[in-house]
Amino acid sequence: MSAVRSKICGITRIEDALAAAEAGADAIGLVFYPKSPRAVTVLQARAIIAALPPFITTVGLFVNASRCELNETLDAVALDMLQFHGDETPEECDGYHRPYIKALRVKAGDDIAQACRTYRNARGVLLDTYVEGVPGGTGETFDWALIPDDLDKPVILAGGLTSANVAQAIAQVRPYAVDVSGGVEKSKGIKDREKILAFMSAVHGT
């Protein structure tokens, strides 16, 4: 049975958060990026978090949010971890005294190891597919062979993962965790319970 951890990202409904928890997900992701079809309001986020059972990590995803916007969200929503998906500097990421993940959009020629060193206080790096002008949630995979074997940060693998390819991804990359959004959806922002169950079964090798 795989010990790889998992996050279901882009949660917008209480029932989807509960489905993720019941299927064995370790974390849920809440998107605070207004341009995303999976964005949630503060009120939505609070209701979702209030409905969660214990020991589910809540991750807030931000894209180039201002300090004021982010602090207002943190004052109102009980987030366990931050996920920065934009062009935030290490200093900006460090400025909220919260554990954080830095997303890196991977393409050929990138020095992922150097990026890990740059964001030295990140708890992990989320490796996602590079699509110009799109900060994430593309639904496309990237060449996993581009990921170095000796990164000094836990790797959270994202980008086009589904129940059909996540076992292969885990075997090849050996990530700390996998992150899925579109791969478990009926439509953008609306999760599919059966797809969540199938994805988690593939992650756990059951």
Swiss-Prot record:
Pfam families listed in its UniProt record: PRAI (PF00697)
Gene3D superfamilies, A to Z: Aldolase class I (3.20.20.70)
Keyword terms: Amino-acid biosynthesis, Aromatic amino acid biosynthesis, Isomerase, Tryptophan biosynthesis
Record-linked InterPro entries: Aldolase_TIM (IPR013785), PRAI_dom (IPR001240), RibuloseP-bd_barrel (IPR011060), TrpF_fam (IPR044643)
Keyword Transport among record annotations: no
UniProt key word Heme: no
EC number, as in UniProt: 5.3.1.24
Top-level class of the enzyme under EC nomenclature: isomerase
Reaction(s) the record says it catalyses: N-(5-phospho-beta-D-ribosyl)anthranilate = 1-(2-carboxyphenylamino)-1-deoxy-D-ribulose 5-phosphate
Molecular function, one GO term: phosphoribosylanthranilate isomerase activity
Pathway where it operates: Amino-acid biosynthesis; L-tryptophan biosynthesis; L-tryptophan from chorismate: step 3/5
CDD domains in UniProt: PRAI (cd00405)
Family, similarity comment: Belongs to the TrpF family.
PANTHER family per record: N-(5'-PHOSPHORIBOSYL)ANTHRANILATE ISOMERASE
Name of the protein described by the UniProt record: N-(5'-phosphoribosyl)anthranilate isomerase
Lineage, top ranks: Bacteria, Pseudomonadati, Pseudomonadota, Gammaproteobacteria, Pseudomonadales
